[in-house]
Each structure stands twice: as C-alpha cells, then as structure tokens.
C-alpha cells in the first residue's frame, strides 16, 4: 500500500510512479527480489475503486498493489540458463500472470475468475476480481503426484498411471 501527496492537485504519470515506488517500499528478505508490482486499485481522497486515476483531482493518492517476489538465485539461474542457449532474457514473468494473458479475457478478469494451472510438479493459482490480480499461490501437489498415486493404487508402472491420468 503506497500513499503520496498529489503535487498539482491533479494526478499525473509522475504521481503514479511515486505512489507505486511508495507501495514497494516494504521489507523483503535479502534472498528475495520484487518481480512484479501489480496495481489493484487507486484511492484519491478516500474515494476507493479507481482504476485509472490520471487526470483526476485530489490531494492524496493511494495505491493498493499486489507485490510478487521471487528468489534472487532462482531468477539468476533462469537467466544464466537462457543465456547459455544463446538467447537474451527480456523479462521474467510470474507463471500465473503469463498463463492469464494467454487464456483469460478482460471480461473474465473483470467478473472474477480463479486460474488453476496444474503442471507436473506444482499447481499454480491466480485469483482475479474487478480486472486485477488479487492473489497468487503455488501448491506443491500436481500432475506427477496424481500419476504416481494412480500407479501405486493400481500397483502398476508410473507410465501406466500417465496414460490413465491423461485419459
């Protein structure tokens, strides 16, 4: 949550940048870094629910944001791996956010939706309401565990569990 005074009584891009900077001024562990600062809503003089405050008038601007952090070492290792392949990293994006760009519509984000991406090793979750991401999470239970559970229950090979789980 960031709070700043609106300098000229009208919200300009510089005011938005300042309030976002204020919102990210939180203590995070040294082994973590901020990956994304995702604005959820703005508040001008206690008027809540503002999505686009540019040009609006007031004296106090607040921003409610969703901060996404990641392990510094994990990000560095991903970047090193990509560079070893002869490619450059333009940006690291949270998996749930990237998935949401490819499968959700603006209407779904606005109405409210829970995106659940069941991968092999983890299940990634993102909750959207009123057009903004409100929560992200990772559950360490996913497809590989389901496959192994099926194979164990049927006392068969994991490869058979894969076939059953995907049918």
Where are these regions (language model features)?
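Nucleotide/phosphate-binding catalytic cleft detector across ATP-hydrolyzing
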Residues: 1-115, 132, 157-160, 166-167
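Glycine-rich phosphate-binding loop of actin/hexokinase-like ATP-binding domains
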Residues: 65, 111-153
